[in-house]
């Protein structure tokens, strides 16, 4: 049944109509009533079907709306959370800014202790004082300009200001002059001290030059003495060969004394080389010792020995010659060591003199004891290189 078709009229029957009306008419009315009921039922079914589809559509729409609302709610919740987070960050920043704007005592102390800030404050303080002075001066000038030319107070005030300005200028000049005088005095002292240092440096340079010259001279003398020492060494080797070739006891006795003297003389020259030309006293003592040995040998020559003692004397002379040669070698090695260092120590000199004295025979010392004082007195006249040259001349 469509909406365009008109609905049948509703049939209404009362009890009187049932009693009065005929059967055919009642059936016709009943049919009309049935048609009306069917029309209502069809309309109701149509309405029900339309309502279900509408409800379903509305339900779907409501579900979509609910989903959209839920999504919007989630978005809004997220936005709210972000806003709350931003609010918290803002509150923390506000608190931090408040703390920064209201620094603590420690921060204030640290800022005041900072040298850069202190310098900045000092400059600001100086500028403030200057501006204050300028302001006071301007105010004084302004107040002075307010006075009339005939005003006595204004004249007195300006005269007082001029007097104070002059006094300040004089005080500043005095302070600057005193400081300049102090600086000039200090500068003069420094100049004097520098001149003294320069003079002392020049003296030291001259002294060093003199020392260099002396060292060069000593090196030249050492070279000459080394050459002489080599010559004496060669001569000693020749004398030793001659001594070995000699066969007669008397000749061996006489020739044995000469190498001993020569070995002692060369040993003394070697000991002189250890300390250079300056140690003349030690060389004189050593030459006196050599004088002792030579005079001891001459005394032995004065007294003739028995034939039985000839071999003994030759043996003793050979022993003395061997000892003299060994002592000469030791002295020569020590002399070369001392030549390497021209300023030899006195300990090496005393050690060499002790070695030389220890090589003497007790018999020779006994023989020389009688003439020791006279020989020492004669030998003390010699000095320096002259003693070594005389000894070498006597050996040659």
From Swiss-Prot:
One annotated GO molecular function: identical protein binding
Regions of compositional bias (Low complexity) in chain numbering: 240-257, 278-291, 304-316
Modification type Phosphoserine: residues: 14, 305-306, 341, 388
GO cellular component, one term: RNA N6-methyladenosine methyltransferase complex
Residue ranges, compositional bias (Polar residues): 340-356, 380-396
Residues with PTM N-acetylmethionine: 1
Database matches in Pfam families: Wtap
Induction context: In smooth muscle cells, up-regulated after serum withdrawal, when cells become mature and non proliferative.
Expression across tissues: Ubiquitously expressed.
Entry keyword annotation includes Signal: no
Amino acid composition bias (Basic and acidic residues), ranges on this chain: 357-368
GO process annotations (BP): mRNA modification; mRNA processing; regulation of alternative mRNA splicing, via spliceosome; RNA splicing
Protein's cellular compartments: Nucleus speckle; Nucleus, Nucleoplasm; Cytoplasm
Phosphothreonine: residues carrying this PTM: 350
Keywords: Acetylation, Cell cycle, Cytoplasm, Developmental protein, mRNA processing, mRNA splicing, Nucleus, Phosphoprotein
Disordered: annotated segments: 240-396
Sequence similarity: Belongs to the fl(2)d family.
Function: Associated component of the WMM complex, a complex that mediates N6-methyladenosine (m6A) methylation of RNAs, a modification that plays a role in the efficiency of mRNA splicing and RNA processing. Required for accumulation of METTL3 and METTL14 to nuclear speckle. Acts as a mRNA splicing regulator. Regulates G2/M cell-cycle transition by binding to the 3' UTR of CCNA2, which enhances its stability. Impairs WT1 DNA-binding ability and inhibits expression of WT1 target genes.
Subunit: Component of the WMM complex, a N6-methyltransferase complex composed of a catalytic subcomplex, named MAC, and of an associated subcomplex, named MACOM. The MAC subcomplex is composed of METTL3 and METTL14. The MACOM subcomplex is composed of WTAP, ZC3H13, CBLL1/HAKAI, VIRMA, and, in some cases of RBM15 (RBM15 or RBM15B). Interacts with WT1. Also a component of a MACOM-like complex, named WTAP complex, composed of WTAP, ZC3H13, CBLL1, VIRMA, RBM15, BCLAF1 and THRAP3.
Protein name: Pre-mRNA-splicing regulator WTAP
Protein source organism: Homo sapiens
Lineage: Eukaryota, Metazoa, Chordata, Craniata, Vertebrata
